[in-house]
Design a protein with these regions (language model features):
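Well-ordered alpha-helical scaffold segments within catalytic/enzyme domains
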Residues: 1-3, 41-55, 94-111, 156-174, ...
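Extended glycan-interaction surfaces of carbohydrate-active proteins
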Residues: 2-34, 57-88, 92, 116, ...
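N-terminal beta1-alpha1-beta2 module of alpha/beta enzyme domains
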Residues: 20, 29, 33-41, 45, ...
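Residues within HEAT/ARM-like alpha-solenoid scaffolds
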Residues: 90, 110-117, 153-156, 174-181, ...
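Active-site neighborhood of glycoside hydrolase catalytic domains
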Residues: 152-196
Length: 335
């Protein structure tokens, strides 16, 4: 596909996302679906990349209004109310990445100042679950009791969110040495003590995100990152189709394929990144959205009739990462 064609495609995908935004500013997965803070931020980043500043600003205003006093958000919201009463550490810190990307694109310093208390609260909630080993517990339940497990994927994302939080603080003339220190503790734990992660009993290591997220967030880079990706390529990739969500499922997903594409773009493998994007183009629907995934080799859309806003956001982010340049290239996690 040409750059112009990709531009038209992501503009239609942005229309799809914006068309699902509620008057409150929340961006649910689909009509009458739930809104979770992490995917909501991913959609806001995608809207920013397409110049939809009004919609993205409303998305962040929703986050500001729904943030809990302790800096967290509930896991899901629906019809304006909390749906699942858990507080995810990754959800709370990820707002920093979204706010920083909005600033990089819009250059709106007033927005950065207005969102600072939200960012500060979210990150401080997350760091309240960091352990001396560097790991950050997954979440707290409705009783405020921590879930004593640290998924590698969410920990990698928290690492990047902390770096973005430090950048926000610096842009505002503030110091945040404890955030920088916390990010380095996470990095050391991931690089030196991987056995500390994914200890809850679930086979989280069988998920593609655990494979590529340390590369996507810059925890593994250079030739080591390329070797890391090659090491499990044959396990997760179905040639011509995309990336499996998990090893035990016979389907590939657009979101995972796009995140892997971003990871490849980050380490300079842009041609391979574009190839992955080409593979998911058949899942682009007439309304601008993308089907969540497809069963292989049958080629049957799966789950049936599901087109999520965050899937379209993933396509936008990956497209910019693979064909963009300058600061906006890899803007999902880099800036």
């Amino acid at each position: 596909m040409t750059v112009q064609t990709f531009g038209e495609l992501i503009d239609r995908a942005a229309d799809f996302i914006a068309g699902h935004q509620l008057p409150s500013g929340a961006i649910p997965w689909y009509r009458d679906g739930v809104t979770d803070p992490w995917d909501h931020v991913a959609c806001a980043i995608a809207l920013d990349l397409c110049g939809r500043f009004e919609e993205s600003t409303r998305a962040y205003e929703w986050l500001s209004k729904t943030q809990n006093p302790d800096g967290s958000w509930w896991y899901y919201y629906q019809d304006g109310l909390p749906k699942e009463m858990a507080k995810d550490s990754n959800h709370s810190s990820y707002v920093a990445t979204g706010v920083w990307q909005h600033y990089l694109i819009s250059k709106d310093m007033d927005f950065l100042r207005q969102m600072w208390p939200v960012v500060e609260g979210g990150i401080n909630f997350t760091l309240g679950m960091q352990q001396p080993s560097g790991v950050v517990w997954w979440a707290r339940d409705y009783k405020d009791e921590a879930w004593p497990s640290a998924p590698l994927t969410t920990s990698s994302c928290i690492y990047q969110s902390l770096l973005d939080g430090v950048k926000i603080a610096k842009a505002l003339g503030l110091d945040s040495p404890e955030w920088d220190e916390a990010s380095q503790k996470i990095a050391r734990a991931i690089r030196e003590k991987p056995e500390l992660f994914d200890t809850a009993g679930d086979n989280l290591r069988g998920y593609a995100m655990n494979w590529y997220y340390p590369v996507l967030t810059g925890l593994i880079d250079g030739e080591r990152a390329r070797e890391h990706i090659r090491g499990e390529w044959g396990e997760f990739i179905v040639e011509g189709w995309g990336c499996k969500c998990s090893l035990d499922q016979p389907w590939v997903t657009v979101a995972e394929t796009c995140e892997l594409s971003m990871a490849l773009a980050r380490i300079g493998e842009t041609q391979q990144a574009k190839t992955l994007l080409d593979w998911v183009m058949p899942l682009h629907d007439a309304d601008g959205g993308f089907w969540t995934g497809v069963r292989v080799p049958e080629g049957i859309v799966y789950p049936p009739d599901e087109k999520t806003t965050w899937t379209s956001a993933g396509v936008i982010l990956a497209t910019v990462a693979s064909i963009g340049d300058g600061e906006l290239s890899n803007t999902h996690l880099k800036g």
